Amino acid sequence: CTVIENAAEEPEICDLADFLREMGADITGDGTDAITIMGGKELHGAVHEVIPDRIEAGTFMAAAAITGGNILLENIREEHLKPVIAKLAECNVKTEAVPEGLRVSRKGRLHPIQLKTMPFPGFPTDMQAPFMSLMAVAKGTSVITETVFENRFIHAGELQRMGADIKIDSRSAVIEGVETLTGTKVKATDLRAGAALILSALAAKGETEISDIYHIERGYYKIDEKLRALGAEIERKDVH
């Protein structure tokens, strides 16, 4: 018997446990901070459908929010996105559960918020950078506090190049919303930073060129094609 203490409670952990149980494993406690595994069983094959990517869903919700768009997200699990949905509501973004999925829309300017990242079921650290893009064009002062990872505000410098007013103080970022951002050449420094730059580019005036997009491709499958399908002017090109 193995007991994993201080275990992550994220939906992805529960999904992995579900998969292993389907293969014959004896696992209990997933979704809590203590997981118990009874070893010694021979595992067998299984067919398993992986849960939808809640961070990709959250990123598209943020895309609708920053552009003032109206999109329908299919195949998502609302219970995995509760903290994101709650913060979007504070931002003046409407989410509505419909038979086909979740509809996301905004009328009027984004509102500023106070946000603190936490392990699940708190606000996900992977949505911190996309929300910084939202707050950069909100009306008023927002504060984001990062409690999960160190040095996770690297994207702030690239957003500043687009005209964002962001000040970093240790684990907190203070964002004064501006009317508009301006397109320029920026660099994706990591996966979620790259997503944040795409969001800001969608809302910015003029053209934005994002380099080092291999970071983005690590976590978003054909994001340019999906955004084009929603009406975005975005194209991938080789730069030599």
Predicted regions: what they are:
Residues 1-240:
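Short, structured segments at the rim of ligand-binding sites
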